[in-house]
Amino acid sequence: MNLPNKLSLLRIILIPVTMIFMLPVSIYGFEPQGWNSFVATHGMLIAAIVFIVASLTDMADGKIARKYNLITNLGKFLDSLADKMLVIAILIAFVELHRVSAWLLAIIILREFMVTGIRMLAAEKGVVMAAKMIGKIKTTTQMIAIIYLMFEPTILKIGGFSYDYANYPVNAITIIGDVLFLICVIMTIISGMDYLLKNLSYFKNAD
């Protein structure tokens, strides 16, 4: 396995690491108070740093693959899979924290299912689809929104506001987070429609 593919795998491995620091542990009544207190105080900031490292591997694997001619079908698959898993897992955590609407997350997940379906139809014809530019823009807006939302509690704390997700303040700081997330949802819809319209032939020619 070449280096770009290893970086994609690393991105997948970092997903549970990120979520561990985002969410308090509560499993069938088991709630370690010391750990959960640490997560509530410092967890999101640590999760943000881990997420940024994971995002940097996304930038690095593509550049290395192109520079050293290490582009493979496995690499195209892993890169796309790692991106989807990372974004969806982190957004699920934000839904659990009541910071992101489940309805908006559903739009993102449905888009990914649709694109995956198109990729499967293309694969049956021997075509492996690499990520398109509009898809990369979509991913970039998602990464920016997620990183901001992760740093949002720290920004609120510096500003003297409460950052309890159960009683989240509505102010310029949180509105910026809402706007950034809405932009990424809009780009998700646009890129999904672009993907669908440009690949309708796979549906028309499917058995």
Question: Where are these predicted regions, by residue range?
Answer:
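Alpha-helical transmembrane bundles and membrane-interface segments of multipass inner-membrane proteins
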Residues: M1-D207
